[in-house]
Regions:
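Short, Lys/Arg-rich flexible segments
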Residues: 1-154
């Protein structure tokens, strides 16, 4: 982030740099993770999310290898945009609330990426095994299991 801020020209860049430094200092005792989290999400949802994000080999004798559908990676630009909009509302006195808000934005961004799609279509065999034709959407488990957690730094 620091190298990027050096390239931001003008007063707006230095204002943003100061704002981000305040946030970094205020949040130095905690951080937020989002996605499919051990101890929060079910092991089945974590495995399913991993296979969908990165792809997998054959899932049955009838099926072809499962292609990667990087829904979490695709969510990042929208999450970054939403986080930039939330920076002005950050209060240094409430870093835990800010991190919880950031985590909610991140988890919602992952859910939206699943819903919006734009992925390679399901194979005929897969279509025969599920209710709809939308990749990544079947039971709603992956959307429901996307989570966030605010953690203390070690």
């Amino acid at each position: 982030m620091g190298a990027t801020l050096k390239h931001v020209a003008g007063r707006q860049g230095s204002t943003l740099a100061r704002r981000l430094q305040k946030i970094r200092t205020a949040c130095s005792r905690s951080y937020v993770v989002a996605g499919y989290i051990a101890g929060v999400s079910t092991p089945a949802a974590i495995a399913k999310a991993y296979k969908n994000e990165f792809g997998a080999g054959r899932t049955s004798d009838l099926d072809k290898p499962m292609p990667a559908r990087p829904f979490m990676a695709m969510a990042i630009p929208d999450i970054v945009y939403a986080m930039r909009k939330s920076l002005p509302a950050f209060h240094v006195e409430q870093p835990e609330e800010f991190l919880a808000s950031a985590g909610a934005v991140m988890a919602n961004g992952i859910r939206e990426s699943i819903d919006l799609g734009g992925f390679r279509p399901n194979a005929p065999y897969t279509l025969s095994q599920k209710r709809g034709d939308k990749p990544l959407v079947d039971s709603g488990e992956m959307q429901a299991e996307a989570a966030f957690q605010v953690r203390a730094t070690a």
